[in-house]
């Protein structure tokens, strides 16, 4: 037999390592140990199993050719030994043995290794609040809990649900409850927005409004402080500083932490973000590798360390570990946290840095915001997809892209293309000139990503001067905050009428194609905030006004297409 490879963890990175290593090292003796009875399942599919999109939990455990990934499958098809219900309790690095115990009997044993792989994943963070351990409070940490939750839904035991945490998993679970099952669902998020630190507030607001329109109550800026039990000891209420919400079930989706205790107790180098590894995913012990949610990852844009708990990355990392076990020397460049999330009839996605994150990382960052069509404007299924391109003004490097749109592949296509370019240090020019596939049913002749880059170019070269969304919203909430501002609305009169009626002198109407004739009628003592539907007409008007000496203008990036999705309180009633 060849080298003894022992892998701790059998969900994503571990099985991927084992299967790739088997293909590269036919003579290796490969063993996976996992403390659970279920292995190698699609954990990211759990919310869709709960929702009913995936009918049977066994589908999450099957291959694309419909074989269930269990111990027998791995042994017979892959030649890999899997020991389930076996907990790794220690690593004897000197003697190169993994210390394990049987979960049921407590019997202890050792497994010798030449190379060890730690892929222990992550563990849910449970808020340290009263009632967090009550019956009826669940984390989404494994398939067993998902089966239990779906069983309660299917038997009519859940009429109301509270999800604590407005991250991706929490929102996916909220949709799962509210959509198919019709459960009265509330989301409680401590931070002032959904998907905090991942997307910028204006994109979060669009997401929040859509979820509320689909029947989910969203309470941001208020964390859960207590979970109250009924007379049977079951969770029945969630308390925040502002309200008490009745519930039949509580989902604790407040993030995850790396499961790195085994490595730490063995004396390996760890950080708050996970097990420290080099670019070949070796730990501080060259005979021990690590992959998946349990490792610390370098951000490919900022260079900062972070935790990236994504099944896609875990599989990629597992392959790289196997390559290095076989001596191929494959390196891991890091990650950017690219994600896409379904939210009822919409989706939201991002890659790289948000504007807030980019500025916090020290970049001279700005953002081009657009609302382009996802396909030819004359095509029947055309829809707008608000996009944001974050860039560094000093270097023209693109730092991140965010998108929001209908539940199709339009946003995903732009996020994926952006991720590939950003990973290679792509600039505004690279994005502007990137050749994207085109046919009217799929895209516009000048793709949405190209258009966003062109806006970024105009901004970076100071051809286009913008008012930011936060600045515009603050002014709309209180005109006295910027008394020398006025809106110049160049949309069709039918679109403008309600605004001029409501806002009076603060709202100037001048149709786009009449500006060249009538610009002398514009007020000269005001800074004009030029508004159209998506920003294109506004920029052209700004360029023209500059040419005739009127330079006190600012463009609202993304136009009112963004505003309608954000549903501000000042919006005129229909």
PLM features: what roles do these ranges have?
Residues 133-157, 229-237, 241-320, 417, ...:
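FAD-site-proximal beta/loop scaffold in flavoenzymes
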Residues 430-440, 444, 451-485, 493-529, ...:
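Rhodanese-like catalytic fold shared by cysteine-dependent sulfurtransferases
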Residues 27-31, 77-79, 83-104, 111, ...:
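A Rossmann-like FAD-binding core segment of flavoenzymes
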Residues 2-4, 294-409, 440-444, 448-477:
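Mid-to-C-terminal Rossmann-like scaffold of FAD/NAD(P)H-dependent oxidoreductases
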Residues 2-83, 176-199, 338, 417-420, ...:
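Beta1-alpha1 glycine-rich phosphate/pyrophosphate-binding loop at the start
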């Amino acid at each position: 037999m060849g080298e003894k490879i022992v892998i701790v963890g059998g969900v994503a990175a571990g099985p991927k390592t084992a299967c790739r290593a088997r293909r590269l090292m036919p003579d290796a003796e490969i063993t996976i140990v996992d403390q659970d009875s279920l292995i190698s399942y699609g954990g990211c599919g759990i919310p869709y199993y709960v929702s009913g999109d995936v009918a049977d939990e066994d589908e999450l455990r099957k291959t694309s050719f419909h074989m269930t990934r269990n111990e027998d499958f791995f042994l017979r098809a892959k030649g890999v030994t899997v020991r389930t219900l076996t907990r790794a309790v220690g690593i004897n690095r000197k003697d190169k043995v993994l210390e394990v115990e049987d979960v049921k009997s407590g019997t202890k044993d050792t497994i010798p290794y030449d190379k060890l792989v730690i892929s222990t994943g992550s563990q849910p963070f449970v808020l340290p609040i009263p009632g967090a351990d009550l019956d009826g409070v669940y984390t989404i940490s494994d398939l067993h809990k998902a089966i239990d939750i779906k069983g309660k839904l299917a038997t009519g035991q859940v009429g109301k649900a509270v999800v604590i945490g407005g991250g991706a998993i929490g929102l996916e679970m909220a949709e799962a409850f509210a959509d198919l099952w019709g459960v009265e669902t509330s989301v409680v998020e401590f931070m002032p927005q959904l998907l905090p630190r991942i997307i910028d507030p204006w994109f979060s607001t669009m997401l929040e409004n859509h979820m509320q329109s689909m029947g989910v109550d969203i309470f941001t800026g208020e964390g859960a402080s207590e979970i109250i039990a009924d007379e049977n000891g079951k969770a029945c209420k969630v308390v925040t500083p502002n309200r008490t919400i009745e519930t039949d079930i509580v989902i604790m989706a407040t993030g995850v932490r790396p499961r790195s205790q085994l490595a730490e107790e063995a004396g390996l180098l760890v950080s708050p973000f996970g097990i420290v590894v080099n670019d070949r995913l070796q730990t501080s012990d060259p005979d021990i590798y690590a992959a998946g949610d349990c490792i610390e990852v370098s951000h490919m844009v900022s260079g900062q360390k972070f935790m990236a708990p994504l099944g896609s990355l875990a599989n990629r990392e597992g392959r790289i570990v196997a390559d290095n076990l076989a001596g191929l020397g494959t390196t891991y460049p890091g990650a950017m946290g690219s994600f896409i999330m379904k939210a009822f009839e919409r989706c939201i996605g991002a890659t790289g840095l948000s504007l807030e994150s980019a500025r916090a990382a020290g970049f001279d960052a700005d953002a081009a915001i657009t609302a382009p069509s996802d396909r030819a404007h004359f095509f029947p299924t055309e829809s707008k997809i608000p996009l944001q391109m974050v860039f560094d003004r000093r270097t023209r490097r693109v730092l991140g892209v965010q998108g929001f749109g209908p539940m199709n592949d339009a946003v995903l296509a732009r996020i994926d293309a952006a991720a590939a370019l950003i990973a290679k240090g792509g600039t505004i020019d690279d994005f502007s000139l990137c050749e994207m596939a085109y046919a009217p049913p799929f895209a516009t002749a000048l793709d949405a990503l190209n258009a966003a880059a062109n806006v970024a170019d105009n901004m970076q070269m100071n051809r286009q001067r913008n008012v930011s969304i936060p600045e515009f919203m603050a002014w709309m909430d209180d005109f006295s905050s910027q008394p020398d501002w006025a809106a110049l609305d160049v949309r069709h009169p039918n679109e403008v009428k309600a605004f001029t009626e409501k806002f009076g002198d603060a709202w100037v109407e001048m149709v786009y194609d009449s500006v060249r004739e009538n610009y002398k009628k514009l007020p000269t003592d005001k800074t004009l905030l030029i508004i159209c539907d998506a920003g294109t007409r506004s920029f052209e008007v700004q360029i023209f006004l500059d040419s005739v000496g009127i330079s006190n203008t600012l463009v609202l990036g993304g136009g009112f297409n963004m505003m309608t999705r954000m549903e501000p309180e000042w919006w005129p009633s229909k």
